[in-house]
């Protein structure tokens, strides 16, 4: 009987080290090739199964994604174990459909321990409980994460004080040992919706702490951050700790509550600088004047002196972290072309005509339209208000689209209908001068005067 057990043990161990990826031998010069969902499943099995000598099989191994994977991947790489190799996404995107609402450490990668994940985007949906991130749920020790882009919607079902939820990274939780330094995160961006009713929530990173100093630089949130809670929640990093190094961080996305911090929340690292956020998109009662900017101030090279050379700048567009080409994806370009409100206005309180960015790209302009008829968008991007209420603006760029809802409170300086009997042009015209046969709700020009029709 023991001979049979020994035979099956040897067979199992041999099977554990034999890999069947789309190619490669796992070396730096000949990495394992990841081309489909089956390869991702193989990597997940490899990560969770110890090798013949009991060591982590991914240690010292290299992996490269060869193409976008559009078939949804429903698993986790490093759920039972941890990833300790080098995963090069090659600038490609993996579609996710991970629905594990009662599980912790949920993301494309569950735990990355002193491994590297870079040059990768994910899309789709990720749902978990605590420590939930679109790309990495829990990087630890000297994990190296850079050039990462999340398009997925990331949701946590937790109401915990330490939910640790982020678009790119959930929570950097585990303690670095001995002389090890903390994790390094650089040149990452979130474009997805991030939501939880727990604490420690951020557009890019939920929580960073319990290590001997993590280094976080050149990261930005463009997505929507939503919670019914208000503690340790911010546009970009929910809860960095005092010993972190945090530099060149930006939030250009929207927040569901003004009780959130505009860019980083809760703790205040001693080594921190170059933090900015768009106060017209991310209206926050936690006001830090040195960090606040109007949208118009953020366009082009307006913040280059603050953010430096690791960002991409273009006229009429928001800065983007240089992510080795991922910053030029359709989604990244689209979210860098904002609604540009007048000074003093915010998304939930628009009182003046405004502009929309058309981008500054080689492959065509961003196209905007207003869905409820309260705003007229002209060819140069000027947006003319024709009435009060909620307007939904839709922006499209190639294959990508997004909606921006604004609440129009009315137009400054016009409070009633002005009926004129003066001679002259008796034709009803909109504010761009075009004749209107039957005026509806909005602002018009008639007989040389502005008239509001309620």
What residue spans do the PLM features occupy?
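Solvent-exposed, low-complexity, repeat-rich "mucin-like" stalks and linkers
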Residues: 335-366
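Extracellular/luminal low-complexity segments enriched in Ser/Thr/Pro
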Residues: 139, 379-388
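Predominantly extracellular beta-rich ligand-binding scaffolds that present long acidic/polar faces
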Residues: 19-335
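Terminal processing/anchoring signals of secreted or surface-associated proteins
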Residues: 18, 120, 411-417, 433, ...
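Residue-level detector of functionally pivotal "anchor" positions at catalytic/ligand-binding pockets or at interdomain
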Residues: 335-345, 407-432
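A short beta-strand micro-motif common to beta-rich folds, especially ectodomain repeats
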Residues: 389-398
């Amino acid at each position: 009987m023991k001979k049979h057990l020994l035979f099956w043990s040897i067979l199992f161990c041999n099977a554990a080290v034999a890999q069947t990826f789309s190619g490669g031998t796992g070396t730096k010069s000949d990495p394992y090739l990841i081309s489909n969902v089956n390869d991702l499943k193989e990597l997940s099995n490899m990560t969770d199964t110890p090798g013949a000598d009991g060591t982590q099989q991914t240690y010292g191994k290299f992996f490269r994604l060869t193409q976008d994977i559009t078939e949804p991947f429903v698993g986790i790489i490093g759920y039972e174990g941890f990833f300790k190799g080098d995963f090069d996404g090659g600038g490609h995107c993996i579609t996710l459909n991970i629905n594990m609402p009662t599980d912790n450490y949920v993301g494309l990668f569950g735990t990355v321990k002193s491994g590297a994940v870079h040059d990768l985007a994910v899309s789709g949906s990720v749902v978990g409980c605590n420590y939930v991130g679109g790309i990495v749920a829990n990087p630890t020790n000297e994990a190296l994460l850079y050039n990462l882009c999340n398009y997925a919607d990331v949701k946590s079902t937790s109401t915990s004080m330490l939910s640790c939820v982020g678009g790119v990274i959930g929570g950097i939780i585990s303690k670095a040992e001995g002389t090890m330094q903390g994790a390094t995160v650089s040149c990452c961006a979130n474009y997805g919706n991030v939501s939880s009713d727990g604490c420690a929530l951020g557009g890019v990173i939920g929580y960073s702490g319990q290590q001997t100093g993590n280094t976080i630089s050149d990261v930005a949130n463009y997505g929507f951050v939503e919670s019914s809670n208000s503690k340790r929640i911010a546009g970009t990093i929910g809860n960095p700790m005092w010993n972190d190094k945090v530099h060149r961080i930006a939030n250009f996305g929207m927040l569901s509550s003004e009780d959130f911090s505009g860019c980083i929340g809760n703790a205040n690292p001693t080594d921190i600088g170059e933090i900015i956020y768009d106060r017209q998109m991310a209206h926050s009662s936690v006001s830090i004047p040195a960090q606040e900017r109007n949208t118009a101030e953020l366009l082009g090279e307006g913040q280059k002196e603050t953010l430096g050379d690791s960002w991409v700048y273009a006229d009429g567009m928001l800065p983007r972290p240089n992510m080795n080409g991922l910053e030029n994806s359709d989604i990244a370009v689209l979210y860098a072309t904002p609604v540009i409100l007048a000074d003093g206005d915010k998304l939930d309180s628009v009182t003046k005509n405004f502009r929309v960015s058309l981008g500054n790209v080689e492959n065509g302009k961003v196209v905007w339209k207003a869905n409820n008829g309260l705003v007229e968008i002209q060819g140069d991007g000027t947006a003319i208000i024709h009435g009060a209420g909620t307007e939904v603006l839709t922006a499209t760029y190639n294959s990508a689209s997004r909606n921006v809802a604004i609440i129009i409170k009315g137009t400054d300086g016009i409070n009633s209908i002005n009926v004129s009997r003066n001679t002259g042009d008796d034709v009803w015209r909109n504010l761009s001068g075009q004749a209107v046969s039957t005026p509806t709700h909005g602002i018009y020009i008639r007989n040389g005067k502005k008239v509001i029709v309620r």
